[in-house]
């Protein structure tokens, strides 16, 4: 591996996120010398940073689009539904550190195998082969979580999200729901679909904190951020 390039790094206003050369997002690499996907690795003042590419991560694109709600810090407990091969999760792993934990639910065995390689080095990621629509099948593994993050391309993704919040959300937990309009209904205008998602979240008595369109990074996607009320 070639030597990481030295760059100028400053903290972003969101905890655990950094900005490189006033341009790109970074997280401090929890496992030095290790890449997870095609990200570049940089050095600054003896620390190693990984580039967080918004075109590869919906959470990074939400940050680029002005996300304000940020529950991730050292020690945060995260349930990640639809973790895939761990691109976004690896950056959350950098931020929450060894004191935190990510329970990563993934339905596709082939993809989960890729995640296993990431989790081997990153002890704060727990891969779970399961269907996010059946939280009862993994309730013996997952603990009550500070954050529930969902990126599941299913028509009934809102229902899956609500079900998991009911099972695993601590009071005042924050939920992130990344919605791809076309996976709900190809025939409908994305705006109509997003309004429908918002209505369902409000009907469930969740506090809607933010809704952010993820264009141009992810076409026809929106990130919804909710807070679970204390007595829900």
Curated annotation (Swiss-Prot):
S-adenosyl-L-methionine binds at residues 87-88, 106-107, 131-132, 151-154. Keywords: Methyltransferase, RNA-binding, rRNA processing, Transferase, tRNA processing. Gene3D superfamilies: Phosphorylase Kinase, domain 1, Vaccinia Virus protein VP39. GO terms for biological process: box C/D sno(s)RNA 3'-end processing; tRNA processing. SUPFAM superfamilies: S-adenosyl-L-methionine-dependent methyltransferases (SSF53335). Its EC number is 2.1.1.-. It is an enzyme of class 2 (transferase). Pfam families: Fibrillarin. InterPro entries: Fibrillarin, Fibrillarin_CS, SAM-dependent_MTases_sf. One of its GO terms (molecular function) is rRNA methyltransferase activity. PROSITE patterns: FIBRILLARIN (PS00566). NCBIfam families: PRK04266.1-2, PRK04266.1-3. Belongs to the methyltransferase superfamily. Fibrillarin family. Interacts with nop5. Component of box C/D small ribonucleoprotein (sRNP) particles that contain rpl7ae, FlpA and nop5, plus a guide RNA. Involved in pre-rRNA and tRNA processing. Utilizes the methyl donor S-adenosyl-L-methionine to catalyze the site-specific 2'-hydroxyl methylation of ribose moieties in rRNA and tRNA. Site specificity is provided by a guide RNA that base pairs with the substrate. Methylation occurs at a characteristic distance from the sequence involved in base pairing with the guide RNA. This is Fibrillarin-like rRNA/tRNA 2'-O-methyltransferase. It comes from Nanoarchaeum equitans (strain Kin4-M).
């Amino acid at each position: 591996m070639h030597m990481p390039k030295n760059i100028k790094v400053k903290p972003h206003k969101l905890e655990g996120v950094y900005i490189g050369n006033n341009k790109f997002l970074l997280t401090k690499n929890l496992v030095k010398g290790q890449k997870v996907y095609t990200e570049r690795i940089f050095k600054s003042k003896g620390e190693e940073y990984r580039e967080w590419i918004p075109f590869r991560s919906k959470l990074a694109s939400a940050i680029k689009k002005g996300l304000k709600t940020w529950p991730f810090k050292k020690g945060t407990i995260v349930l990640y539904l639809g973790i895939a091969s761990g691109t976004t999760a690896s950056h959350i792993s950098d931020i929450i550190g060894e004191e935190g934990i990510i329970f990563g639910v993934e339905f596709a065995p082939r993809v989960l195998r890729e995640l296993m390689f990431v989790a081997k080095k990153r002890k704060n990621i727990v891969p779970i082969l399961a269907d996010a629509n059946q939280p009862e099948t993994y309730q013996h593994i997952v603990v009550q979580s500070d954050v529930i993050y969902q990126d599941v391309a299913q028509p009934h993704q809102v229902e899956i999200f609500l079900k998991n919040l009911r099972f695993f959300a601590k009071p005042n937990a924050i939920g992130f729901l990344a919605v791809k309009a076309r996976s709900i209904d190809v025939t409908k205008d994305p705006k109509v679909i997003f309004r429908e998602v918002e209505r369902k979240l409000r009907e469930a008595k969740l506090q809607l904190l933010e809704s952010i369109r993820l264009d141009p990074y992810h076409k026809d996607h929106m990130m919804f951020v909710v807070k679970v009320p204390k007595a829900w």
